[in-house]
Amino acid sequence: MASFPSPPLAAAAAAAPPRLAPGLPLAAAAVRRPSSLARRSSIALAAPANPLRCIHRRAVSPRLRRRTEAVGAASAAIGSLGEEREGCLSCFPRGRRRGRPGLARFAPCALPHTYGLSSLHSGLTGAKIRRRHVLHAAGPDEPHVASPTWSETALDKHYVDQPIGKEELEGFLNTPLPSHPKLVRGQLKNGLRYLILPNKVPANRFEAHMEVHVGSIDEEEDEQGIAHMIEHVAFLGSKKREKLLGTGARSNAYTDFHHTVFHIHSPTKTKEYGEDLLPSVLDALNEIAFHPKFSSSRVEKERRAILSELQMMNTIEYRVDCQLLQHLHSENKLSERFPIGLEEQIHKWDPDKIRRFHERWYYPANATLYLVGEIDDIPRAIREIEAVFEHTLPEGEAAPMSTASPFGAMASLFAPKLPGGLAASLTGERSPAADKIKPVKRERQAIRPPVEHKWSLPGVAQDAKPPAIFQHELIQSFSINMFCKIPVNQVQTYKDLRSVLMKRIFLSALHFRINTRYKSSNPPFTSVELDHSDSGREGCTVTTLTVTAEPQNWRSAIKVAVHEVRRLKEFGVTMGEMTRYMDALIKDSEQLAMMIDSVPSVDNLDFIMESDALRHTVMDQLQGHESLLAVAETVTLEEVNTVGAEVLEFISDYGKPDAPLPAAIVACVPKKVHMDGVGETDFEIHPEEITDSIKAGLEEPIYPEPELEVPKELITRSELEDLKLQRKPSFASLSKEENVVKIFDDETGIAQRRLSNGISINYKITQNEARVGVMRLIVGGGRATEDSESKGSVIVGVRTLSEGGCVGNFSREQVELFCVNNLINCSLESNEEFIFMEFRFALRDNGMRAAFQLLHMVLEHNVWLEDAFDRATQLYLSYYRSIPKSLERSTAHKLMLAMLNHDERFVEPSPHSLQKLTLQSVKDAVMNQFVGDNMEVSIVGDFTEEEVESCVLDYLGTVSAPKSSKTQEHIEKISFLPFPSDLHFQQVYIKDTDERACAYIAGPAPNRWGFATEGNDLFNVIRSSSGDAQVSESANTDLTERKHNDVRSHSLFFGITLSLLAEIINSRLFTTVRDSMGLTYDVSFELNLFDKLDLGWYVIAVTSTPSKVHKAVDACKGVLRGLHSNKIVERELDRAKRTLLMKHEAETKTNAYWLGLLAHLQSSSVPRKEISCIKELTMLYESATIEDLYLAYEHLKVDESSLFACIGIAGAESGEETTDDELDMGLHGMGPIGGRGLSTMTRPTT
């Protein structure tokens, strides 16, 4: 769903955001997207995981919010069994939008703040496992259970110090887990249940979510999609919700199988008068959920929007997700009630039919209200809830429901639904005698979702289903999913928590083992993932083995995956593995529990909502940690292997009489494949071949796992002392004029240093995240330094270094386990302007020194391997070949090549360019940029000055970095294609079974610091025009006006004004193109502002239908060019300011944001970045005027001669095939297609 324009202030990538480039992050290209149900407990077994995880930073929607799903509240105590997905189980609840592959999508931001700390590599779970810092981790199965009381001594001891009696142990394990001490639950007389949780982050704001327990699973045969329709009509038709927008509140809604959620993120008080906003927010939710207006005009408007959304969602990824869900749940309605609905039915419903469905399901007893945030006076909040909702009764229900005591048990959320009553509601029509019948109380269903499953349990007699095969011309790679479906194990006792912990240990070992197979240059698989997680939306626990491979390698890939699963099942984990992963989990839990007061309200709320759906006990982080410590002491190696083996039996024992049968086996395969020397041939595969390959893999001989030596340090104390004697590290003067070796700014707390080898250092001490630090190395150059003979050398080089993952004499496996033991997340990335490394580390047990050791080893003792180069080259080759199979990526690719005059530095390298590269050439391209005065390191965290400066001197001061850089001299000219040209407007046609369309419109813009193409300094233009004006002015110029002229000369003037402009244009696009004209569901305006290069551009992205896409493009152009005829008004500017300032204020509570603010503070290639850009950011936003915005608007090139557009159309009648020479349309490689369920939930409504 199209996001309402309120993107985060600083959502662009830190100093150098990703550009409009047709592609997903390389990690996505190299590794299949997560096994779709977005189960956070999935384990990426063999993604190209390595300690130096590589990302060529690409397009990310600024509104893209990672919403996590869940194993359960109590299992938060030990963390997810795997990675965090991009998005929820099926799509994008709460503001999340699918980032368009191929387009860099950025929030309007003056100072971008993050290169991607949220996706840092976790040493524990591999490249695909993005264990984010737990500001985000309030989800039900996140590792939030750390305790500040777990000592190093305790970590070193055996987990069971003294024998414990069997009866005593059983008694302890059967004890219920403690409940969250601050969570308040209650129920009104009409059945509405509410939950209130005080939470301090973000300050002065709260979340209010109304969950109505009705979704697509409750629809009848002729109502498919009607729950989603009601979500739209009720939400967007609410006048009370609209009134809140002026207060700085944000709102949205989404629909899934089992529920519909309306949510508002609001300040606690109005800015102007300090009035309490809680009553207004509750009133708006009451109107939306229980008193919507089903006017014909609103229904028709939303019908158009939903039909557009349906076509937009209908990607190959969505179709694959549907296939997986259909086979997994073939025995129940989950296989056929996708939330978006059926197009033919959406066309038919009139307001009365929609209203009848609402009357049947939208009543207080079938809803739960969640309030999380700065709610200091809980009794008052309860009174406000009662005042707003107490009198809301379902139509025809006169008698109040009996009062229930506040419910503490999870099961009370699932009161049984009475079978009788309201027969008329089954048809949606009122009986004439309805008023004479005694009203019957309506309560929510006892089971959500109300479906029956066929379980994959040992000894359950049922016929095995043969593997299903889904073939499509838009699928590029082979993937197979083996599913096992069992009832949810509700985590309510210590025994339940202990089981989750043991599974986590077992599956972590499986990931690491299979990952070692990436040592070979040509592994048979692209990725192997094992996902084990609970799903509230499906009402079951699903284990999924997902294998992806190049089509020609599919048999070998299956054999390797099932063979490794059987080996672990038969031999189990070793004592060393159990100790290692247990220690890592305990350390992780300590770190995360320290952040108990830093978890955002929305994440806590999601955590509670999903936990309640699964009936897991909800604990806070400290309770969870204490519970984890208690059960950890009882875990034995034998039990870990027993519990883990049960998870894997459906694979390891496949074909045996008593083995649990897979719920489904589904292969998604291309119709045609490219064979070297042959060309395109049909891809043939049969179910029995799949079965034979599984059995063959299980029959391979197996051997136990050898123990691996894990280094405790990468640089010994004696080695360090020798280095210090040789290189004599010291801090040098920051200025040639003065002998100043340190600058400290009292207002921001930022310290600046410079080492004698030329490396610049910025750091800030914060308590945002207790005993956690983040660090970023930025190296100037990036892809811009590639010349015509070395296209792709930088990104392939960075990927090669990452693929190898070795440093010095340590293997990749040793380095990865070193990261596991020290809770270090690390990534290595590149974009057009920079190469950068990012670290996230815990400060306990010398974690910061360990992170600095790793950085030192990468800089001093990096290892370049031929097989890693081969893998990196193959990954980019495969990704390039997959572009023609994606409508969005093909369209974006063609636009980029045209706009930037076929400059390959801004798109994926072509096969021709890749063939020219060698290991030495890519190594030189990367390492030539790693010179002293071209490197800047920023560190933010909860450390002391002594700690950070000691690490800096010891490990960065001893780097033998050259002191001069000639990077600037090697940047070839970058220019926009001149007008006139046939390439200013293009079209792309993709053959597909279903129709879809999208378009991109782009044009030149200045960079963040006021430089335009050809190096023109726009501040000179401003000074020239203002100088002419001053000649005629009085000498008594108003002081305020003079101050404002100072604002216009501020180095961040264009960054600020363009950010505000983007907010306003986004809002107008939504209102005009989507809401008024009904031409699209999803339209957005994004700015791409470089820091170092003297250019930038804007992008409008719009999805539509083939019949409307040209009109949508014209409408977007009209909005873009209409700012002169339809002037910006103060109300629009105020709203844009409020949105960006509130997000800035909220983000300053995070380390990652500060890391971005520090970027380039001492960079000679970004001379206009200085401390005032950080100190005066708020003032600059507040001071901006409409006239300032028009000054910036004059330098957005929106005329016909500067504007580029490309329309992409997919359908059976594909028109002319794309003839772009850069794309080899006949080659089909691997492309990420997502996984089960990722795209089936509806987009957020706005």
UniProtKB/Swiss-Prot annotation:
Gene3D superfamilies: Metalloenzyme, LuxS/M16 peptidase-like. Its main location: plastid. It is an enzyme of class 3 (hydrolase). Disulfide bonds: none annotated. Its EC number is 3.4.24.-. GO terms for biological process: embryo development ending in seed dormancy; proteolysis. GO terms for cellular component: chloroplast stroma. Zn(2+) binds at H228, H232, E309. Its cofactor is Zn(2+). Keywords: Chloroplast, Hydrolase, Metal-binding, Metalloprotease, Plastid, Protease, Transit peptide, Zinc. GO terms for molecular function: metal ion binding; metallopeptidase activity; mRNA binding. It comes from the Eukaryota. Residues 1-136 form a transit peptide. Binds 1 zinc ion per subunit. It is found in: Plastid, Chloroplast stroma. The active site is at E231 (proton acceptor), E302. Belongs to the peptidase M16 family. PANTHER family: NARDILYSIN, STROMAL PROCESSING PEPTIDASE, CHLOROPLASTIC. Cleaves presequences (transit peptides) from chloroplastic protein precursors. Initially recognizes a precursor by binding to the C-terminus of its transit peptide and then removes the transit peptide in a single endoproteolytic step. In a next step, pursues the cleavage of transit peptide to a subfragment form. This is Stromal processing peptidase, chloroplastic. It comes from Oryza sativa subsp. japonica. The lineage of its organism: Eukaryota, Viridiplantae, Streptophyta, Embryophyta, Tracheophyta.
